[in-house]
C-alpha cells in the first residue's frame, strides 16, 4: 500500500516510524510545514518530521498552503492509497481529501468529540481532566468531525504537564496506529460517527489564557501552570516585569486569608502566594 504521511512536530515522528517499519506499506512521500527560523539566531530549521523522513530517504513536500493547485497536483502525482496525518498544522481541503482511494485518516490527541482543534492536550490539563486519549478517525471537511476508527484512553496524573502528556500521547498514538493498520489494510474497519452535539473545542492558547489571575481558585491555577508547561508558560508580573511560572505544588486546604496575589511566605521550597480559594 502506498501511503503519504503528513505531520510536523515531534508528536508525529513515532507514527511515521511505525509506517516506515510496516512491511506492507511504502511511504511514498511526507508532507510537513516549511522550515522556520528558530532560536535567538533565527536559524532556518527543518521540522522533526522532515528530519525523520530524510533519514529514510523519503521525498518531502513543504507547501506554504496545501490548497494551492500546484500543491494538490504534487500530492496526486504520488498516487497514495491512503493519507495519514498527525499534527500536520493545516486543514486538508476537499481536493486533497479526494485523492487517496482509501481516504485520509488522522491521529488526534483527544477522545473525540471532546477537544476538537489545535490544542487538545493543553486544554485537557488546564481544565483539570483526569484522563484524555488518542483517536484515529477518517478526515472530513469539518474540523476533526470525521467518523472514529479507534481510540485509547490515558490517565492524567497530578505530576503530569502538557509536556509529559505530549510524549505519552505521541507514543500511544503510534501504538494505536500499529494496532489499527491490519484492519485498515484488510478493509474491515467499522467506523463510528461522532456525537456532534457533545463536541468541545480546543483552540490554540491565547495570551490572555497564559496570564495568572490570582483571584481564581488555587486548584484552577495549579492546572493552568501544568497545562502551559513547557510551552508557552503561565505568567504573572512583578514590579512591571513578566515572570514565567513553570511549576507549583498541588494546593491543599489553607486558612490563610490574604488578598489574592499577596506573597505570604518565601522559603527554600518556593514562594507561597494567596489565591482566590486556598
Residue ranges of model-derived segments:
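Donor/substrate-binding cores of folate-linked one-carbon enzymes
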Residues: 82-201
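Residue-level detector of anion-binding/catalytic polar loops
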Residues: 59, 131, 242
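N-terminal beta-loop-helix "entrance" segment that forms/cooperates
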Residues: 36-56
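N-terminal Rossmann-like dinucleotide-binding module
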Residues: 1-41
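An anion-binding loop in the catalytic cleft
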Residues: 21, 32, 215-278
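Internal alpha/beta domain cores that form substrate/cofactor-binding pockets in large enzymes
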Residues: 2-4, 27-31, 55-78, 83-85, ...
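Acyl-group handling in specialized metabolite and lipid biosynthesis
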Residues: 203-216
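Structural motif corresponding to alpha-helix initiation and N-cap regions
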Residues: 13, 43-46, 68-72, 118
Amino acid at each position: 500500500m502506498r501511503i503519504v504521511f503528513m505531520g510536523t512536530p515531534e508528536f508525529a515522528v513515532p507514527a511515521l516510524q511505525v509506517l516506515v517499519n510496516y512491511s506492507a506499506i511504502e511511504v511514498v512521500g511526507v508532507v510537513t510545514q516549511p522550515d522556520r527560523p528558530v532560536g535567538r539566531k533565527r536559524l532556518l530549521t527543518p521540522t522533526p518530521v522532515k528530519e525523520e523522513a530524510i533519514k529514510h530517504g523519503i521525498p518531502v513536500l513543504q507547501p506554504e498552503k496545501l490548497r494551492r493547485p500546484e500543491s494538490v497536483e504534487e500530492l496526486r502525482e504520488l498516487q497514495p492509497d491512503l493519507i495519514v496525518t498527525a499534527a500536520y498544522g493545516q486543514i486538508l481541503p476537499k481536493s486533497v481529501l479526494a485523492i487517496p482511494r482509501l481516504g485520509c485518516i488522522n491521529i488526534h490527541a483527544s477522545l473525540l468529540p471532546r477537544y476538537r482543534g489545535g490544542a487538545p492536550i493543553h486544554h485537557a490539563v488546564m481544565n483539570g481532566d483526569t484522563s484524555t486519549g488518542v483517536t484515529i478517525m477518517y478526515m472530513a471537511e469539518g474540523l476533526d468531525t470525521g467518523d472514529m476508527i479507534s481510540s485509547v484512553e490515558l490517565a492524567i496524573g497530578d505530576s503530569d504537564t502538557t509536556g509529559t502528556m505530549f510524549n505519552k500521547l505521541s507514543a500511544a498514538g503510534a501504538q494505536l496506529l500499529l494496532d489499527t493498520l491490519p484492519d485498515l489494510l484488510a478493509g474491515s474497519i467499522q467506523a463510528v460517527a461522532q456525537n456532534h452535539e457533545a463536541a468541545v473545542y480546543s483552540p490554540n492558547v491565547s495570551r490572555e489564557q497564559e496570564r495568572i489571575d490570582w483571584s481564581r481558585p488555587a486548584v484552577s491555577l495549579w492546572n493552568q501552570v501544568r497545562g502551559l508547561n513547557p510551552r508557552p508558560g503561565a505568567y504573572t508580573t512583578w514590579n512591571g516585569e513578566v515572570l514565567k511560572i513553570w511549576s507549583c505544588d498541588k494546593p491543599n486546604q489553607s486558612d490563610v486569608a490574604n488578598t489574592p496575589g499577596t506573597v505570604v511566605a518565601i522559603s527554600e521550597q518556593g514562594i507561597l502566594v494567596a489565591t482566590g480559594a486556598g
